[in-house]
Amino acid sequence: MAEELTPENPAIPETPEETEEPIKQRKNGLYPGVSDELAENMQSGWADTELHDLEPIAQAAETAARRAALSARFPGERLVIPAGNLKTRSNDTEYSFRASVEYAYLTGNQTEDGVLVMEPEGDGHAATIYLLPRSDRENGEFWLDGQGELWVGRRHSLAEAGELYGIPASDVRELAGSLREATGPVRVVRGFDAGIEAALTDKVTAERDEELRVFLSEARLVKDEFEIGELQKAVDSTVRGFEDVVKVLDRAEATSERYIEGTFFLRARVEGNDVGYGSICAAGPHACTLHWVRNDGPVRSGDLLLLDAGVETHTYYTADVTRTLPISGTYSELQKKIYDAVYDAQEAGIAAVRPGAKYRDFHDASQRVLAERLVEWGLVEGPVERVLELGLQRRWTLHGTGHMLGMDVHDCAAARVESYVDGTLEPGMVLTVEPGLYFQADDLTVPEEYRGIGVRIEDDILVTADGNRNLSAGLPRRSDEVEEWMAALKG
């Protein structure tokens, strides 16, 4: 990683008249300063690289429709939706940036420091996207600042951004001042841009801002055709990532769970933007830890591998799929018994996903099957109705059986309870169905042979007009089909 050139005492003037923001300084740079001659040289001799007649982003029509729905919900109010800022990982390195879901959902843009402002206009709103313009050649920002274009890449001009996103673009450096002077009702999506929030401190309330956040969460409960297509892309890439993992299990045995994590990550970066969440590559007893993301344990033949992972597309839509695989390629008798119980529970859950059904129905259906098996195996005293009423199965099932899926792996999290978990399924909703059984290594209430076995099966289910469609059906689920699939991949 190259060291920034920014001198501690640059020769380039930094008065307010000559630059709107000071060049970021770096201590311990190797260059003592910038000569006037070099500064002048760097200001000129650059070709015009403005782009013209750009094709709008693929989802431009959808983002416009989403903004129209937002406008209709909050007439006469100024709405401010920030993308967020870069976050420091350590010293002068940053985490990879991911724009706020609310901002990306409404604009399609993923640029740090961006802000969407919806200004009341007539019966609706006029949208403006505020972005940082091209790096300034005059003040040295483009080559001296660690966030300048010669360091991190070319930015779109404001005109280019307007063409791409179908929204007029303005300089974000002018926004905070105009917001401070603005009058009338304002709402802002909180938690992403402290500077924008500070400019609105005396104009907003937490309660009103939460209403904006809730609306934008509930707006995503039903996916449009573009979103469904993106989720299918994410799932298809995820299927290929799972295939990649099976092919290298022998190498993982020689190293650790990290090899599995790295293998899947390669697929995610080659075909998508990233992984949608920290991959869970849990071998052996680690499968009993629901969100095992350390991925530093051994991979042993004879154990199970619980792989919970998803590719995120370039538009931020993520898959969320889990399979529990026999590392040797074949389930033991007990592993198969437990796996088949979870499979039966998932089958019952998926069958309950249909328009008009209660959201909770698929969870209840899955939990009933698992409770029946636990009673049948003598692990908990029946009858089944008693077990379910008291929630006794939860010692081994632990978590809810699914969640909404979209631009967040746990999508629509701010939605009202009555719209989500107490709501009714509609065509276009996408959710996971993911029952599991987890027998902890130190659980003395189960026979010793059960201890350390964890199984989860998870698929991404689209509610359709007449039932449902399993977006991740390309991955085998039944135990015998899993074994056949693994054998074919291993050759």
From Swiss-Prot:
InterPro entries: Aminopep_P_N, Creatin/AminoP/Spt16_N, Creatinase/aminopeptidase-like, Pept_M24, Peptidase_M24B_aminopep-P_CS, X-Pro_dipept-like
GO biological process: proteolysis
Record flagged with keyword S-adenosyl-L-methionine: no
Note: S.lividans has two genes (pepP1 and pepP2) which encode aminopeptidase P.
Protein name: Xaa-Pro aminopeptidase 1
GO molecular function terms attached to this record: manganese ion binding; metalloaminopeptidase activity
Keyword terms, alphabetized: Aminopeptidase, Hydrolase, Manganese, Metal-binding, Metalloprotease, Protease
Annotated EC: 3.4.11.9
GO cellular component: cytosol
Source organism per UniProt: Streptomyces lividans
Keyword Protein biosynthesis recorded: no
Catalytic activity: Release of any N-terminal amino acid, including proline, that is linked to proline, even from a dipeptide or tripeptide
Cofactor(s) listed in the protein's UniProt record: Mn(2+)
Enzyme's top EC category: hydrolase
Coiled-coil intervals: none
Quaternary assembly: Homodimer.
Region named Disordered: 1-32
Binding-site list for Mn(2+) 2: 308, 320, 458
UniProt-annotated binding residues for Mn(2+) 1: 320, 403, 434, 458
Protein family: Belongs to the peptidase M24B family.
